[in-house]
Amino acid sequence: AQLGALRDLDYGIYPYTTSSNAVAAYAPVGSGLPTAKLDEVVGVVKAYSSCVGEGPFVCEWFGEDAQKLRDAGSESGAKTGRPRRVGPIDLVATRYGVQVQGATNIALTKLDILSYMDKIPVCAHYELDGQQTDEFPFPVCLQDAKPVIEYVDGWKCDISKVRSWDELPENARKYVEYVEQAIGCHIGYVSVGAERDSLIIR
């Protein structure tokens, strides 16, 4: 939902987009499925932000914080090995992505990567021209937007072996619920690892 929508030719942060449409509405076009037959759209959102390529990235981290998150999440290009740009989850951009994708459900991935943090930062709002906003601005304004960061208590334990919602630490569940409420879409799936069975269904 987040990175895919922002790289879409029509809905993304042009000119830092792909040459095609990356939103869910165009999936039937390439697969031969009638659009009206889509009953559910599952948006995939990382528990933090990552970015490939140039362009505005409001909540981007630099230095040691960025490197720690990059190392924890193995955030480097599959072919080039180039380090990806990373930062806390951007709820403003994610909410926009959910809206333009028409998502009816969300799969929140890589929750386990945040397990090393005492306090987990989230970009809850933007500040633009001295005003706080929850609306995703026009691309030309993004360079001037500043992140408004809030913090959620971390859980500080390995959750990669957890296989049910109730087994997750309370603070991990609270983080998921916080994101869910902020983006206005149910999070039905939570990924806690790279294994096939590391997907928790709520």
What kind of region is each of these model predictions?
Residues Q2-R202:
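Non-transmembrane, aqueous-exposed alpha-helical and coiled segments at domain scale
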